[in-house]
Design a protein with these regions (language model features):
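Positively charged, low-complexity terminal tracts
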Residues: 1-80
């Protein structure tokens, strides 16, 4: 698992998500879709109602690192 704070561009150790039920249902749906396709080929953005908050989710493994930007490769390989 890798977590990036896009604002500070730093890896994050812990994260708390507080979701409304509709957001949790949407997140589950996105995760199910990601599991059904090849890792790294797609990602999803989960936003709140006014788009002021966003969670981006994607699947990765060692075979698909080339699908990611250099920043994400560093995060995935070194957790930096």
């Amino acid at each position: 698992m890798r977590i990036l704070d896009e604002t500070t561009n730093k890896s994050v150790e812990t994260l708390t998500l507080l979701l409304e039920k509709a957001e949790a249902i949407q997140l589950i749906g996105y995760l199910e879709q990601l599991i059904d396709i090849a890792p790294g080929t797609h990602h999803y953005h989960l936003n709140n109602d006014d788009y002021s908050k966003e969670i981006t989710i994607s699947l990765y493994d060692n075979s698909n690192l080339n699908c990611f930007s250099d920043r994400y490769k560093l995060l995935i390989t070194k957790d930096e």
